[in-house]
């Protein structure tokens, strides 16, 4: 009976692993044209917000100051400047286009990831039976190992996720998530996450080892502490 259920469960596991990549690839192309049309229509029908106007004005002043400084260095600045150089107008237009493209890609990535998470959640909900079978396989495989191998795997997992060098890995993970959703990097959030999340995870793992694993296999806990303290 277990062998008959083996193939569907393995196929379900492969489906879950490949699902995010497939959804991202297919929906990116489908949503890109629709979001572009919506964004262009929205931009043409609405005025600039106060934040956008402020950013454009700051950019204009910055470019004007740089242009005047460049003319001063070249010795071409006149006593009275009647109007800003024509190049500033083109640069402002180009900057606005780039800014709009950034907003568009942010909306596109965010929408694609929300759809992917929704489909993935639905797949987990509909595939409860396969998840139960996979969970039973993992537990059976783990319990059939001797205590030394179990302790080795537990140490490997804990050191990988909460070890000395794990902070760099978690930083890469949070940066990848921000980049995948199209969000602007925030160093403060990165620092808080890297400093707090591994500590919370380490506490949960120690709680599991002390309370849960100690009831299942006291000898395994003894081996685990002996290896970790060596």
From Swiss-Prot:
Its main location: plastid. It is a multi-pass membrane protein. InterPro entries: CemA (IPR004282). Disulfide bonds: none annotated. It comes from Triticum aestivum (Wheat). The chain crosses the membrane at residues 7-27, 107-127, 145-165, 181-201. Keywords: Antiport, Chloroplast, Hydrogen ion transport, Ion transport, Membrane, Plastid, Plastid inner membrane, Potassium, Potassium transport, Transmembrane, Transmembrane helix, Transport. GO terms for molecular function: antiporter activity; proton transmembrane transporter activity. This is Potassium/proton antiporter CemA. It catalyses: K(+)(in) + H(+)(out) = K(+)(out) + H(+)(in). Belongs to the CemA family. The gene is cemA. The keyword Membrane applies. It is found in: Plastid, Chloroplast inner membrane. One of its GO terms (biological process) is potassium ion transport. Contributes to K(+)/H(+) antiport activity by supporting proton efflux to control proton extrusion and homeostasis in chloroplasts in a light-dependent manner to modulate photosynthesis. Prevents excessive induction of non-photochemical quenching (NPQ) under continuous-light conditions. Indirectly promotes efficient inorganic carbon uptake into chloroplasts. GO terms for cellular component: chloroplast inner membrane.
